[in-house]
Amino acid sequence: MIITIDGPAGAGKSTAARMLAERLGFEFLDTGAMYRAVAWACVARNVDLNDAAAVSETAASISIQFEVERIICNGQDVTTEIRSAEASHAASIVAAVPGVRLEMVRLQRESASGHNYVTEGRDQGSEVFPDARCKFFLTA
């Protein structure tokens, strides 16, 4: 079963999703962390963030795994690094790249397939998981 939580920045999506997942015994899919991991990989590889092809190629070439309270990118725990101001800024740039978006949507769907997930983030209920059983939209 998939439960999605959408809404604007600062609405409390991540907090609500984490709490709901814990309460239901579901896994939590932090989609923002996925974009941050792509941004981190781009910065670590000195990829020009204005080069959409290179950014998309980076997104397609990395491995992103979720473990309990940790984000693993290419075998490295990047949980702390992806929360930096630099990664946040870079994430907003890479998230606007269509190739990155396609790859992240593919990965989100693949990750959730056959699992019970609470997922939050941009367009989760409308685009990523349009057939989700429960969809919420939070406002600040």
Question: What role is predicted for each listed range?
Answer:
Residues 3-5:
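Hydrophobic anchor at the beta1->P-loop junction of P-loop NTPases
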Residues 13:
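Conserved lysine of the Walker
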Residues 16:
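Hydrophobic positions on the alpha1 helix immediately C-terminal to the Walker A/P-loop
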Residues 21-31, 44-47:
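Post-Walker A helix-loop "phosphate-sensing" segment adjacent to the P-loop in P-loop NTPases
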Residues 33-117, 123-128:
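ATP-dependent small-molecule kinase phosphotransfer cores
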